[in-house]
Amino acid sequence: MKVRRPRGLLLALIGSLALAVPAGAGGAQTSDEMAYALVKEIEQHRAQTWHRQRVMGIRRTRTTFLERRVGSLELLRQLRDTWRRRAVIARKRLVRPPHRAAWLCIHRYEGSWKDPNAPYYGGLQMDITFQRTYGRYLLRRKGTANRWTPAEQMWTAEKALRAGRGFYPWPNTARHCGLL
């Protein structure tokens, strides 16, 4: 036998509770709450910027952690906007590695970006030694290359290129792409 519950009574109860809540209860934030939220945004944008810079192998942007010593909402907004801008710039640079076309050509003849099969991982088929040497930060943070984004994999390969290895870790595919 099916039990029927009175929906009208439930809706009336919810409606009366909604009217009982004071108008300002969920309203505007205090300046302390706004400052706290701004500091959290600054920290988030800074962490994103530094992560991207580390992946690219460039020095991270310096900071004085001014937001920890200042209470001015206007200054905190300016700092937030500055770090947001830096994070956007770092992201744009991250997704455009210098030899992107070459890495995409090599990838075309290698595996999927998410290839989990040992001994070679990811779209550029990097072995553990290669990942440890040129992508230690990502290997520790995310695991093997199949868990990295395509941009992170290309920047790891870019570090090997800068170190003088050239495209030789991919001898056959680099030859197909006209890189050797």
Where would I find each of the regions flagged by the language model?
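Secretory targeting and sorting signals
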Residues: 1-28
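Intrinsically disordered, low-complexity
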Residues: 21-108, 174-180
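A generic structural signal for short
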Residues: 91, 115-116
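Structural recognition of the beta-strand scaffold that forms the well-ordered cores
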Residues: 104-108, 114-115, 123-127
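Short, histidine-centered active-site or binding-site loop motifs used for metal coordination
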Residues: 110-111, 138
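Generic structural signal for secondary-structure transition and capping sites
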Residues: 111-112, 166
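Catalytic and binding regions of secreted/periplasmic enzymes and modules that target cell-wall glycans
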Residues: 118-124, 128-180
